Amino acid sequence: MKILKVTLICALVIALTIPGFAEIQQRSGKVLEMKGKVDVAQIGGETVPAKVGMALHEGDILETKGDAWALIELEGIEKSTVEIDENSQLLLSKLEMDTEEGSQDTMLDVAIGKILIKVAKLRHEKSKFEVKTPTSVVGVRGTEFAVEVEALE
């Protein structure tokens, strides 16, 4: 009888906790276009040259050198594009979506350089799209805007 109670309690705890974790999924992005030398520092630590069609993931850092640029698409419930200008560095800090709820959470971190972002209108009230720089954070719900970060002295 005691084993049955322990088993039922464990099953109840598992049933109550798993659905909360199962709803959140990692989104991805991909390189749509590029010119010049664009590198991707992947979450595992390896830096590889970017290629058109290459998948991008949360934690990846894109860096453009010289006169290089890249256009990436962030996939999800609402798709957005980010154009990364020359001599820029962009971290894909957070790319999450809750498929059950229909919301998504995006955080981009611009260390240096300029990016042009086209954010699709966020339909769900809990959806977030934020861009962080060394001195500020901006959140939008659907617009087109540019962010430029110059070297701090």
Task: Give each language-model segment a name.
Residues K5-L8, E144:
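Sequence-pattern detector for short linear motifs
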Residues T7-T17:
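Bacterial N-terminal signal peptides
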Residues M1-K2:
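N-terminal secretory signal peptides that target proteins for export/translocation
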Residues A22-E153:
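Flexible, surface-exposed loop/linker segments and immediately adjacent secondary-structure boundaries
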